[in-house]
Structure formats: C-alpha cells, structure tokens
C-alpha cells in the first residue's frame, strides 16, 4: 500500500514555496490539464536546481490533486453550513469572542477532517470539538441573556422617562390627554 508514513513529508511539502504556490494556483484553475501541470511543475523543479528525485510523478500529482479537491470540497461544505448557521442566527447579537470561538471550532473541525482524509483509520478528537462547540453555545447564551437584560433596562428607563414627562405635562394648559399619550408612546418607542 502506498500510504503516507507518519511524520514523513510528501514531495509536494518539500518543494520550495514558490513552486508549491504555482502548483496550487494551477490546480485551482480547472482549465489546465494535469499533464500540463506536471510538465510545468517539473520544469520549475528542474529550474530551481533540485534533484530529479524531487520531480512529481503522474500518480503522485493525481493523488495530491485529489486530496486538494477533497479539502476544497470540505471547505465549501463547511462554508455552506456556516452560512446556513449565520442565516439562522439572523440579527441576534454575537460578540467578537463568540465569533472567535466559532472560528476556532471551525478551524479544529477542518483540521480533523484533513486528518481523517489523510488517514481514514485515525481517531478524531471529538471531545475537543464538542467542548469548543459547547463553549460557543454557552457564550452565545450568555450574550443573549446580556442583550435581553440590556433591552429590559432600556425599556425601564424609557418608562421612567415617559412617566416623568407625563406627570410634568399633566394639568398643563393646552396639553390634551391625546397629545400626552402620543409623547409617552414616542418615549416608549411605540410611535
């Protein structure tokens, strides 16, 4: 079996950064056939003065391209799920800390998916993901409670102001009960 050995980097991982970057750009462009990618990358390897052993084989490039495509597919799925979650949350408040924790959980999920793709028999640290998501849920719940409490305080303050204005205006010449009620409604945000 041609399995990656633990701790051993692939040929692509050992390539210079500029060659790897070019490879990734070419793989993203679906119009470029793998045969041409192989030719150009091997030419870049040769131009860089690297030994012939560093050149990519057709099957090695295909394996790497398949891996990259699988990762891309998983990322697209994750983005769709994130978009759906964001749409579901709507305009509910979400603090920066919550966003950060969700991003960290997303990152950990991505890393776990990558490990699973590279080695299907490996264990995924579900506890870490579960704890991160639980922390995000608790943080979101706290943020919602805080938002609700802040709203209640604002409402109480508005009622207090409306009562004070109503008492001040009550009995004033030229102020009808209807006008007084309209002013009160404006202060309470009901107008």
UniProtKB/Swiss-Prot annotation:
Induction: Expressed in the late phase of the viral replicative cycle. Expression of late genes is activated by the viral late transcription activator C. GO terms for biological process: provirus excision. InterPro entries: Phage_Mu_Gp27 (IPR021874). Pfam families: Phage_Mu_Gp27 (PF11985). One of its GO terms (molecular function) is DNA binding. Keywords: DNA-binding, Host cytoplasm, Late protein, Viral genome excision, Viral genome packaging, Viral release from host cell. Its main location: host cell. One of its GO terms (cellular component) is host cell cytoplasm. It is found in: Host cytoplasm. The terminase small subunit binds to the packaging initiation site (pac) and regulates the ATPase activity of the terminase large subunit. The terminase lies at a unique vertex of the procapsid and is composed of two subunits, a small terminase subunit involved in viral DNA recognition (packaging sequence), and a large terminase subunit possessing endonucleolytic and ATPase activities. Both terminase subunits heterooligomerize and are docked on the portal protein to form the packaging machine. Belongs to the mulikevirus small terminase family. This is Probable terminase, small subunit gp27. The lineage of its organism: Viruses, Duplodnaviria, Heunggongvirae, Uroviricota, Caudoviricetes.
């Amino acid at each position: 079996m041609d399995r990656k050995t633990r701790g051993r980097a692939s040929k692509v991982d050992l390539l210079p950064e500029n060659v790897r970057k070019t490879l990734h750009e070419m793989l993203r462009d679906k119009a470029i056939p793998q045969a041409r990618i192989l030719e150009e990358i091997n030419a870049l390897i040769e131009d860089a003065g690297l030994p012939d052993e560093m050149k990519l084989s057709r099957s090695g490039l295909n394996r790497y391209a398949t891996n990259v495509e699988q990762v891309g597919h998983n990322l697209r799925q994750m983005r769709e799920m994130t978009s759906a979650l964001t749409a579901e949350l709507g305009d509910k408040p979400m603090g920066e800390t919550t966003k950060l924790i969700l991003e960290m959980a997303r990152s950990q999920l991505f890393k776990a998916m990558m490990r699973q793709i590279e080695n299907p028999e490996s264990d995924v640290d579900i506890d870490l993901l579960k704890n991160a998501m639980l922390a995000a849920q608790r943080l979101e719940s706290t943020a919602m409670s805080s938002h609700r409490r802040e709203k209640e305080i604002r409402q109480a303050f508005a009622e207090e102001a409306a009562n004070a204005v109503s008492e001040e205006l009550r009995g004033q010449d030229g102020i009808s009960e209807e006008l007084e009620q309209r002013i009160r409604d404006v202060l309470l945000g009901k107008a």
